[in-house]
Structures are given as structure tokens and as C-alpha cells.
Amino acid sequence: MKKIIATITTLILVTSCSNRLVQHENNGFTYSEISIKEGGKWVDGKRGHKEYEGGTFRNVQEHTLDPQHTDHAFDIRYEGPGWENQNVGYRLYLDWRNAVDIFGKKVKTQVLQDVGQDGFDSYHDPQPWGQDILKAGKSLGIGGFGRLVNDTVAHLHQVENTYVKVKNSKNVSSFEIDYSKWKTADHTTDVKAKVSIYPYDRFSKFELKTFVLTNGLTNGLVKFKNIPLQQKKSANGSWGYIATYGKQTLVDKNDLLGMAIFYKSDEVEKLVNGKDDHLIVFKPTTKTMTYYILAAWAQEPNGLKNETEFYNDLNSKLVQLEKSNRL
């Protein structure tokens, strides 16, 4: 009888609705969501574009962007899909910026379902659970993608349609985004992106595919003054990373954060020192490309507390990637 009850309990947790976590045997969890406003209306905003006024947020499994949506339009809670495990949270700006931001967590429990419910951008201020800790600015944040055109990163200003679908399953939480007819300069392509998080560690997996050969497709890591870039390849050169560590958060002038992107060497054309980002430029292909992002906040409970611990962790992951081609 106890085994039957335990099995039923596990199934309930695994098949839970979109605003509940997926619990795992190791007591970790994963969760992803997107939350949109309903019951309000579009009005002329103070920033020169339409804003969504009134209504209440509701979690949905899938969503097609309203043509009037842009940054700070207030129709999507914390501006895009979010994903987390017990160590870290992330969010992606589902608009022209297409940047990835970081939620630093001070607790090991699920938090995203409540983030932004008490005020659209209250997560910029310190909360008991943590806060938004990264200032992305004009950059791609940590692992967002764009296209390098004449030494300038073109974000997703011109996209005909954007569709996102969220999935919470037994061993992973993820979301997929289909960008239809992304235009940069004289080039147009559809793009599919899949982002996944697991119940352990701090990394998140990105799978990216363009349907037309695209020169200059790039991801990036936001640059901060006086924070040096570190680069390293695995022993056989099959994988590499770019990373930064230091006082580079919104919290206070002494707060420490490590950020990294792991990439497959045979998928990458070059590394570029961009204006706002450290860039990883991919070779043109219509095959799916894979990379991983990782954020380690010094205030994370039982986390990586200093630069030495951070880079030791990255180097151990390079060994793992070389051995198994995955984290």
C-alpha cells in the first residue's frame, strides 16, 4: 500500500499543471513557465508604444506574441518565459532584445510563480527569495542570441511571429520558441530555440536552429568594465568556454557573480570582442547547435563562493563535456 501511495504521489507531482514544480527523486526540482495578462486592454503608453493596462496574470502552456508586444509592455509577467531549479533562475526577454537575465536565489524552493505578482518589476529589489541580479542593458545578457552584422549585433527587431511553448516533465523543464521570418539586413530565416534546465547544478542547455544558412549568428555574454574575460578549451579542444567573474551584479558594488557559456568548438567560427558583449559567432549551418550557460551567484545557499571555486567548477565541466559531449 505504501508503495502504491508513493507512486501516485510521484505521478501527481510529475504531471502537475504549469504553475507547479516538477519534483525529482534527489529532492531537486525544475520549473518553467510563461504568464500572460488577460482581461485588460492595450492603451497608448508613456514610452511611445502600446502598453497593456489592467487584467490579471495567468500561466499558460503556450503563447503567440501579440503584435503590439515589446519591451516594458506589461502584458507578460517578468517579460518572458522563466525557468529555475533549486540553485538558480533565468528569464528570457521575449521581445526584440532576446536577452537572458538571471534570478539570484537565496532559497532552495520554487519561487518563479510568485515573481512579479506584487508589482511588475518588484524583482529588481531585494526579496526574501533573492532578486534579478543582472543588468543586461543593450547586451544579449547571458547566452541570448542575435546576428553580427558589420560589427553590430542585430537583435530580433524584425520578426513576423513568435510562438512559445512550455513543458514541465519528469527529468527536465524546458520551453521552445519558434521565431518566424527573422529579418536582419537582407537576410531572413526562421529560428527554433529550445532551452532546458535540470534538477541539479546551475547550467541551462540551449539548442538553436536556423532554417537558412545564416552568417554571423552569435550568442553573447554581457561585458562589464574592469571584469576580465577568461577563455579555456578542453584537453582535446572539442569544447570551450568563455567566462567572467567579479563584481557585476545589480545588488551592490561588492556582490559577486560568475557567468559562463560553454560551446562546441566545431560549431564556432570565431570569438569576437563586441561593443556590449563577449561574442561566440557560429559557423553557418541548418543543423541544431548546442551550448550551455551557467550563472553562479555568491549569495546562493551552499553555492560557489569565490573565483577559485567558480573556475574549478567550470574546468570540471569541460572534462565532463569532453568525455560525454553533454552536461
Where does each model-flagged region fall?
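Positively charged n-region of N-terminal signal peptides that target proteins for export
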Residues: 1-4
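C-terminal motif of bacterial Sec signal peptides marking the signal peptidase cleavage site
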Residues: 15-16
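Solvent-exposed N-terminal domain segments of exported/luminal and surface proteins
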Residues: 21-155
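Beta-strand-rich recognition/accessory modules
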Residues: 70, 259-327
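A recognition module on extended beta-rich or small alphabeta surfaces enriched in W/G with H and D/E
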Residues: 114, 234-267
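Acidic (Asp/Glu-rich), glycine- and aromatic
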Residues: 191, 202-234
